[in-house]
């Protein structure tokens, strides 16, 4: 059965997900660009992929929920309004990063923190680097990693440094520094294809759900089972 996908935010991520979807036999029924006038009730879509700006992501998602459509949100920087999404009683998937590698980095970082906090000489820090068109700084992925480390028991503040350079897809490093050595856990995205494949996997996974608000942890845990 051919699934019908609507994309809000037809930029780099939106186009990458569209390519994967079409290659998998889906059809794209709507491509919403900046300043377009749109109504999700007119799309005849099965699901929506949202990848725009932090200030518009929640309102876009709420419009789709009101139209009865499940939504995958790839935009970051809007999580201060998460309660609005949760209270809307729709079917939503969101992630600060759709890379499976980043999810593994987060899990390893949690374990690493539990070990490293036993040694008071080590101080954690996070470094992230992205392309110059990246809108939020530090990245949502870096902020998520910081929360994971803090929750896992880090006793010292976690400093985050962010930089923007041309043609950098995405680099994240968790560093543990002491006076005698440095331990670095690093993830570098080589292309956007990994994000797009993860985004498409999230679309497929969410289609099986009736309602709820889900994250990468939910999807990966479900796949593990």
Go through the PLM ranges and name each one.
Residues 22, 65, 86:
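Anion (oxyanion) recognition and catalysis
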Residues 111-122:
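A charged, well-structured terminal subsegment
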Residues 48-49, 72:
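N-terminal Rossmann-like NAD(P) cofactor-binding module of classical short-chain dehydrogenase/reductase
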Residues 55, 62, 75-95, 100-112:
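Rossmann-fold NAD(P)-binding glycine/threonine-rich loop
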Residues 67-70, 88-90:
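A short helix->loop->beta-strand "cap" motif at the edges of active sites that frequently abuts
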Residues 4-7, 12-42, 53-55, 120-225:
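C-terminal substrate-binding/catalytic lobe of Rossmann-fold NAD(P)-dependent oxidoreductases
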Residues 58, 62-66, 106, 110-113, ...:
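Amphipathic, non-transmembrane alpha-helical secondary structure
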Residues 45, 87-95, 178-185:
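Glycine/charged-rich beta-loop-alpha catalytic/anionic-binding loops adjacent to active sites
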């Amino acid at each position: 059965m051919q699934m019908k996908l609507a994309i809000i935010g037809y930029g780099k991520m939106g186009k990458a997900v569209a390519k994967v979807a079409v290659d998998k036999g889906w059809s794209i029924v709507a491509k919403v660009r900046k300043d377009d006038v749109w109504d999700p009730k007119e799309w005849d879509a099965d699901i929506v992929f949202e990848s725009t700006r932090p200030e518009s992501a929640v309102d876009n998602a709420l419009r789709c929920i009101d139209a009865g459509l499940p939504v995958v949100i790839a935009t970051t920087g809007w999580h201060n309004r998460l309660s609005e999404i949760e209270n809307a009683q729709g079917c939503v998937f969101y992630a600060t990063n759709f890379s499976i590698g980043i999810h593994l980095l987060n899990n390893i970082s949690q374990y690493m923190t539990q070990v490293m906090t036993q040694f008071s000489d080590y101080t954690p820090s996070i470094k992230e680097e992205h392309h110059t068109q990246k809108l939020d700084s530090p990245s949502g992925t870096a902020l998520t990693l910081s929360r994971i480390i803090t929750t896992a028991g880090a006793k010292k503040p976690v400093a985050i440094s962010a930089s923007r350079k041309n043609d950098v897809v995405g680099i994240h490093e968790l560093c543990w520094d002491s006076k005698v050595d440095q331990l670095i856990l690093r993830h570098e995205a080589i292309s956007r294809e990994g994000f797009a494949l993860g985004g498409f996997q999230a679309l497929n996974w969410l289609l099986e759900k009736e309602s709820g608000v889900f994250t990468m942890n939910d999807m990966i845990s479900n796949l593990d089972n």
